């Protein structure tokens, strides 16, 4: 019954699972740890919250410290799926982002993405980021869809049609510039309101947003802690499962 304590920063692998039967206090323990990190360190915390469990904690810690992003179809909170920080990915950031967009289109279009579609997506993604660099305006999925419509190939127009629902349609929360503050020390991604149709895409965009924040903090020499409540949810989606 002796208490075993350790500093995760000194371990080879700092990942951890909180396991227990329902009602045993897993989420409470996670909240307690988050509060400790915020009050005693300069680290940042990102939370993926499928059951609307962490909003109250964020509110208690204050608007200067925490923000809750409510992801839901038709909601006012939006995340730019094509946002990319300097140093994104491990190699060429445009190539890395192009692969992410391919995964995103595969989630949207269950028919899959063949070699020709991949070539078109790769080309258009590069063109969109070239335009963004020239104009200083962040690239968005709407820009990508417009660029696809400009291409001569019929398959490009098919991809654009697949993106329509997520850019100008009713599920457009990932198609425009972000409307949320991602710079707070605690960012809670509340995905409770995502329907089954939007959840796979939402998880993919959120994992990419997490990658952006971790990359940015790493360049600053700042630690980032990622908490995933109901972790099995991310494994219901192949791409988010691969990420974690």
Where are these regions (language model features)?
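Glycine-rich phosphate-binding loop of nucleotide-binding enzymes
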Residues: 1-71, 244
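P-loop NTPase motor domains
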Residues: 3, 52-66, 73-244
């Amino acid at each position: 019954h002796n208490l075993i304590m350790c500093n995760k920063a000194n371990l080879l692998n700092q990942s951890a699972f909180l396991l227990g039967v329902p009602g045993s206090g897993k989420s409470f323990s996670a909240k307690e740890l988050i509060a400790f990190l915020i009050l005693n360190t300069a680290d940042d915390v990102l939370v993926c919250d499928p059951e609307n469990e962490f909003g109250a904690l964020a509110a208690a810690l204050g608007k200067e410290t925490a923000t809750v992003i409510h992801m839901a179809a038709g909601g006012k909170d939006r995340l730019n799926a094509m946002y990319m920080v300097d140093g994104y990915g491990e190699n060429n950031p445009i190539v890395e982002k192009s692969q992410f967009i391919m995964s995103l289109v595969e989630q949207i279009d269950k028919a899959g993405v063949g070699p020709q579609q991949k070539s078109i997506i790769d080309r258009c993604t590069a063109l969109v980021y070239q335009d963004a660099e020239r104009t200083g305006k962040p690239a968005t999925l709407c820009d990508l869809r417009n660029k696809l419509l400009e291409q001569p190939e019929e398959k490009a127009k098919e991809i654009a049609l697949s993106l329509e629902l997520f850019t100008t349609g009713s599920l457009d929360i990932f198609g425009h510039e972000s409307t949320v503050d991602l710079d707070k020390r605690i960012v809670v991604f509340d995905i409770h309101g995502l329907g089954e149709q939007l959840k796979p895409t939402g998880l993919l965009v959120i994992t990419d947003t997490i990658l952006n924040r971790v990359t940015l903090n790493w360049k600053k020499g700042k630690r980032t802690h990622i908490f995933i409540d109901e972790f099995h949810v991310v494994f219901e989606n192949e791409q988010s499962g691969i990420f974690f």
